[in-house]
A protein has these predicted regions:
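Phosphate-end processing signature that detects enzymes handling 5′-triphosphorylated RNA
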Residues: 1-169
Length: 169
C-alpha cells in the first residue's frame, strides 16, 4: 500500500465569485511541484485545466490575473468577470492518502485537514460500477460502516470557509 500527502490551496474572490459559477481554482503542492487547476462545470462532470506554475502558495496571497495561465485567465476574466487582484488564497486542505488494492480494484482512504476540521473519506476506484458497488457494500458490512454520499472536498472546504467568514461579520 502507498501513503502520500498533498496540499491543495483554494483560490477565490472574497465574495466567492468562482464558487458562484460552480467552479474551483486551486494550486496543488505535490512532490515539490505547483499545479494550478481550474474546474468548471461541463455537460457531464467537470472540465479541468491543469498547468504547472511558479506561484508558491501561501495564505492570503493575492494572485494577479497576469500570473494566471492564459486559458484560466480567459475563463475567469471573460466568463466570470473576475477583476484583477481580487483573487487570493483562502485556505489550504491537506490530504493524507493511503491506497491499497482490494479485490482487484483500488481502495483509497483520505484524511483531510482544513481550518479546524479533520474528516475521512473512503473511495473505491473501480473498473465496473455494479461489481464495484457489490464489493464496496460487502466491505462496509464487514467493517460495520454505513455509506453516506459526502460533499466533495472542495464543497466541504468552502462550506467551512463560509461558516467561518460569517462568524467574523
Amino acid at each position: 500500500s502507498v501513503l502520500f500527502k498533498q496540499v491543495n490551496y483554494y483560490i477565490d474572490t472574497p465574495d466567492f465569485k468562482l464558487k458562484e459559477h460552480r467552479s474551483a481554482l486551486r494550486i496543488r503542492v505535490k512532490d515539490n511541484q505547483y499545479e494550478m487547476t481550474l474546474k468548471t462545470p461541463a455537460k457531464v462532470g467537470l472540465l479541468e485545466y491543469n498547468y504547472i506554475v511558479d506561484i508558491k502558495p501561501e495564505m492570503n496571497l493575492i494572485i494577479s490575473n497576469d500570473n494566471l495561465p492564459d486559458d484560466i485567465r480567459q475563463i475567469i476574466v471573460e466568463q466570470f468577470g473576475v477583476k484583477d487582484t481580487t483573487l487570493s488564497i483562502l485556505g489550504a486542505l491537506t490530504t493524507y492518502r493511503q491506497e491499497t488494492k482490494y479485490k482487484g480494484d483500488l481502495l483509497v482512504l483520505d484524511k483531510s485537514e482544513y481550518f479546524d476540521t479533520t474528516d475521512y473519506e473512503l473511495e473505491f476506484e473501480v473498473k465496473d460500477y455494479n461489481q464495484g458497488l457489490q464489493k464496496l457494500q460487502s466491505l462496509l458490512n464487514e467493517l460495520n460502516l454505513e455509506h453516506h454520499q459526502p460533499l466533495n472536498k472542495v464543497q466541504r472546504f468552502f462550506k467551512k470557509k463560509e461558516t467561518l467568514s460569517n462568524n467574523i461579520n
